[in-house]
Curated annotation (Swiss-Prot):
Residues the record marks as site: Transition state stabilizer: Y299
Name under which the protein is recorded: Vacuolar membrane protease
Cellular component terms (Gene Ontology): vacuolar membrane
Biased composition (Low complexity): 559-570
Cofactor binding comment, as recorded: Binds 2 Zn(2+) ions per subunit.
Taxonomic source organism: Saccharomyces cerevisiae (strain RM11-1a) (Baker's yeast)
Keywords of the record: Glycoprotein, Hydrolase, Membrane, Metal-binding, Metalloprotease, Protease, Transmembrane, Transmembrane helix, Vacuole, Zinc
Family matches, as Pfam families: Peptidase_M28, PFF1_C, PFF1_TM
Membrane topology: Multi-pass membrane protein
Residues annotated as binding Zn(2+) 2: D168, E201, H300
Disulfide cross-links: none
Summary of the function given for this chain in its UniProt record: May be involved in vacuolar sorting and osmoregulation.
Chief localization: membrane
């Protein structure tokens, strides 16, 4: 009996049990979170257990060390060294394989001229034409069944000028080498193409060039390996559809990691990055974008190096891609379901997939069926007189307390914006914790205050039913979003899971009421009618929250008394119904005077209830013990809390550093934090009003700590630095001054840092800082001259880039006024790989340029003759981007054709000055090497000393990246 008594005591709905269960729940969630984030580090292959995998990892790590020895952007000579190393490794791996072929774009001098929308800004209406000379390395492994649609594996080997490219994208490249080595030993069934591509960073150009290769016709599927962060785990960033998501599910059995929340966030442009996957997808391929995604404040900086990553991260990407490629290469694929997919993993152990369209259909079923069932059960309970009527004060306290919590949260967010808007960049846990504790603490205070003055003995059940109504409304809204987005809002699935579990809990309560015994209820009402002169507390409903009327034989009566007595001390109410009595939710009775026997009158001082009971009822013990609350708790709290916490963590982990990219991103992150914390609070709100004083005290303490950390702690540290963008601009039309541009977030961060630089501090150099769009600040000052070239004389920066007009017939008398104007330019640019020409007419709203010609010098052509590539555009061309491989080729030869104003608007007007058809051409050329030296007059000097100074003297709470495709930009302008 004692064991039974203890068991019943543990299951009682009381403060201690509830608080303990909450503690256990959140402890388990914390342990699962830690397990999820640390487990992959312990799964490295061991030489004695998996010798082949261990060899692949060790070889890949060695390759990564060599590739990331220096910065290697497309605009650098080191880029060629990486290309040559990869080509050597590819030839070593393929050897004399009978089914392997290698193609080197650099050797074949492959180039493309094509019109391209800005891949990093889909809203841009700027018409761009790009000329690109490729050095992609492609490998073809012909499959045993070459008629099957092939698989492309792709990664880019260029880095940005300011990063070593360990994760972006060195790990992807060496993972491709490992995959190549594996599939050489295990010949695939379908044909595999490996694309080690170049110049992803400045236009996704290597991927674009792939479709100029004949092998592109062999592939239908793609695995793209990328790095948009700087380590951690490689996530399934996005995938084409439900079929490809299920292929990932079937193939990646060990450490799967993916979430369609990332996919929705990426397509919604909350992340200002793009990968080669975009190009492959636009060209009709289906597949998987696997990428590192955090931390973004180290992404594209000097800390994207092998020192800041690990073998565990490399193995996670390598093993994921290997599992996926091996499955696709060797199995028939079911690719019928091409609807967008909702998917997620459970702590790296299990991967779940559902079609977004199927989820929408289930949402519709839930939305239709759940209110019908709920209303039906309500009507049954009303008809059977088991429904307990409640005042409007009881019904409104839960939603009003939630609304009050949201208002308090909004007020606190205003304080964050005023005092520390970038706090999310350092640690998003503290603001999320502050928002979360505000909501639950406010709800606790308001509900218990209202219960003090207007007691409600069924608060939990009312709250669960109202939570069901709130979630029904939310699900209706999100389902509409899912439908209107053509099922691309794939990150909304957590709300469907939450709604389903909460609905089950609410319906269980309604079902208990509908099936409950009526006799007790009727007699209780009769007694209340006979004793209406008693105090107001006697009108309280005698059933406690969630109680069931259970008939038990008389021989259990004594044990029931013992059970009740054993827990008497804990059966007090969460609130008092006045100074003289307490309402006990567990019993629905005045606990100060109750006896643990059903024969005691339900109304204080009255024996009429006992007199009114029938002989049968007198022989039965009706036990008012609520054990159903545990089922409700387990349905509503643990699983939804874990899923919602994980979803919020996924969002914040990917976006928290984007607050450095502008005020819009800051408000987005703040909004996600607020909404996410509300969703995290919803599962526990129906229960939280009943926690004990220790729990609520800890909640208040956690809020105070979180609020102080959020508002008072500096947002940037050595490990979480502020990322600043650098460029040095030399405008030859304005002189030779080398103006340094430093771009970063507003907030008095940049100028104090710059004022402490030696070249500024000791020369009184003026720093001009101005606010630019989107909450960013641009600081400019005259910096030290760059040394881009080795020379034996004085460096003349104006000799770095010159423009020669070879031909221009604008003012030719032989040209008809209706005839397009033609000009030829020769750009003389030394040791350069990238330039941009921008076209503008002062007299025409749109660019009048309709045709661009690029004259190439082909080394393989007879006597290195020129070969032309021409592109036309009826809508006009605003910009021409030029990318060439040969540093020794010092010229770009360009032809431009544009329409006179007469052709574009048909207005024949006098042009006495002869300027209406003028075309302004702005030229910008880029140099991206800084971690190297030039020899000037026999002395070794650093190429970009202004950038070196920032790296050497700025506090460690700053990190630096390039503002444009080069660190030094030489500009000029002419009028044609």
């Amino acid at each position: 009996m004692k064991l039974k008594s203890v068991f019943r005591s543990v299951l009682k709905y009381r403060k201690t049990n509830l608080s303990l269960l909450l503690l256990i729940t959140y402890s388990i969630i914390t342990l699962l979170y830690i397990f999820d984030h640390e487990r992959y580090k312990l799964n490295l292959p061991k030489e004695d257990e998996h010798p082949e995998f261990n060899d692949l990892l060790e070889t890949a790590w060695g390759d990564l060390q060599i590739i990331t020895a220096s910065f290697h952007p497309y605009t650098s000579k080191e880029n060629d060294k990486v290309h040559d190393y990869l080509l050597k490794r590819v030839l070593e791996i393929t050897g004399n394989s009978s089914f392997a072929s290698v193609s080197d774009d650099k050797e074949s001098e492959r180039s493309i001229l094509f019109q391209q929308q800005d891949p990093f800004n889909e809203s841009s209406r700027f018409s761009r034409v790009t000329y690109f000379e490729s050095s992609n390395i492609l490998v073809k492994l012909e499959g045993k069944n070459p008629e099957e649609e092939g698989l492309l594996l792709s990664a880019h080997f260029d880095s940005v000028p300011t990063g070593y490219g360990a994760t972006d994208d060195g790990m992807g490249v060496v993972s491709l080498l490992a995959n190549l080595k594996y599939h050489i030993k295990h010949r695939p069934n379908r044909t595999l193409i490996f694309n080690f591509n170049n110049n992803e960073e400045f236009g996704l150009l290597g991927a674009s060039t792939y479709f100029n290769h004949s092998w592109s016709n062999l592939t239908k599927y793609v695995i793209n390996l990328e790095g948009t962060g700087a380590g951690g785990k490689a996530v399934l960033f996005r995938t084409s559809d439900t079929s490809t998501a299920k292929i990932y599910q079937q193939s990646v059995k060990e450490n799967p990691f993916g979430n369609s929340i990332y996919q929705q966030g990426f397509y919604s442009r909350y992340v200002r990055s793009e990968t080669d996957y975009k190009i492959y997808e636009e060209n009709g391929m289906r597949g998987w974008d696997v990428a590192f995604y955090k931390p973004r404040n180290l992404y594209h900086t000097i800390k994207d190096s092998i020192q800041y990553t690990s073998k565990a991260s490399l193995w996670h990407m390598l093993h994921t891609s290997l599992q996926l490629s091996a499955y696709v290469a060797s199995n028939s694929l079911d690719t019928a379901d091409q609807m967008p997919a909702c998917y997620f993993d459970f702590i790296g152990l299990k991967f779940f997939v559902i079609s977004a369209k199927t989820l929408f259909y289930w949402n519709c079923i839930f939305l239709l069926v759940s209110p019908v069932v709920a209303i039906g059960l309500y009507l049954i309970s009303r008809d059977r007189m088991t429904w307990k009527s409640h005042s409007w004060l009881s019904w409104t306290r839960f939603p009003l307390s939630l609304a009050a919590g949201i208002i308090v949260q909004k007020l606190f967010s205003n304080d964050i914006i005023r005092s520390n808007p970038l706090t999310f960049s350092r640690n998003y846990f503290w603001p999320i914790s502050a928002f979360f504790t505000q909501v639950i603490f406010t709800s606790y205070v308001l509900i218990n205050c209202s219960n003090f003055f207007f007691p409600c003995a069924d608060m939990k059940s009312l709250s669960i039913i109202e939570l069901f109504i709130i979630l029904w409304t939310i699900l209706l809204f999100t389902s509409k979003l899912l439908y209107s987005s053509d099922y691309r809002y794939t990150g909304l699935y957590p709300l469907s899971i939450f709604f389903l579990l909460s609905t089950i809990a609410a319906i269980l309560r309604l079902l208990a009421l509908a099936l409950g015994m009526r006799t007790r209820k009727r007699l209780g009402r009769e007694c209340r009618d006979h004793h209406s002169n008693y105090s107001s507390h006697s009108q309280i409903d005698m059933e406690r929250d969630g109680q069931e009327n259970l008939e038990q034989p008389q021989d259990q009566f004594t044990s029931s008394q013992d059970d009740q007595a054993s827990i008497q001390d804990d059966n007090v109410s969460t609130t008092s119904a006045g100074p003289s009595h307490n309402v006990d939710e567990d019993h629905g009775m005045d606990s100060s005077s109750q006896q643990h026997d059903e024969r005691v009158p339900l109304l204080k001082g009255s024996n009429s209830m006992e007199e009114g009971l029938s002989t049968r009822e007198n022989s039965l013990k009706l036990e008012y013990t609520d054990y159903a609350w545990i089922i409700q708790f387990l349905l509503i709290v643990p699983i939804p809390s874990f899923i919602l916490f994980n979803s919020v963590d996924v969002i914040m982990d990917a976006l928290n550093h984007t607050v450095q990219e502008g005020s819009k991103a800051t408000f987005d992150v703040l909004r996600f934090g607020m909404v996410g914390s509300i969703l995290m609070a919803l599962p526990i709100l129906p229960f939280f009003y009943k926690v004990n004083y220790i729990t609520i005290s800890l909640t208040a303490l956690l809020f105070l700590i979180s609020a102080s950390k959020t508002l008072l702690v500096h947002p940037f540290t050595n490990s979480n630095p502020l990322k600043v963008r650098f460029s040095q601009n030399i405008d030859l039309s304005q002189g030779n001054a080398a103006s340094v541009h430093v771009l970063g977030r507003e907030g008095n961060f940049l100028k104090p840092m710059l004022q402490d630089l030696p070249s500024i501090k000791y020369s009184s150099t003026h720093i001009n800082c101005t606010s630019v769009t989107n909450g960013m600040e641009l600081c400019m000052y005259d910096g030290m001259q760059p040394n881009l070239l080795s020379t034996n004389g004085n460096t003349n920066i104006s000799s770095m880039a010159k423009v020669h007009v070879l031909h221009n017939n604008r003012n030719s008398t032989e040209r008809s006024p209706y005839e397009p104007i033609v000009a030829e330019l020769l750009l003389d640019v030394k040791e350069n790989r990238a330039c941009t020409l921008t076209f503008e007419s002062r007299h025409q709203a749109k660019s009048p340029v309709r045709e661009i010609t690029v004259y190439q010098k082909k080394n393989s052509a007879p006597q290195k003759t020129n070969i032309t590539k021409t592109i036309k555009s009826a809508s006009g061309i605003n910009e021409l981007q030029l990318h060439k491989l040969d540093f020794d080729q010092e010229t770009y030869h360009i032809g431009v054709q544009w329409f006179p104003k007469l052709l574009t608007d048909g207005n024949l007007e006098d042009d006495k000055l002869g300027t209406k058809d003028e075309l302004s051409v702005s030229i910008s050329c880029y140099w991206g090497e800084y971690d190297s030296e030039s020899v000037v007059n026999g002395t070794a000097v650093r190429k970009i000393p202004a950038f070196d100074e920032l790296i050497n003297y700025a506090p460690l709470s700053f990190s630096f990246t390039n503002e444009q495709k080069g660190l030094v930009i030489v500009k000029d302008a002419i009028i044609l």
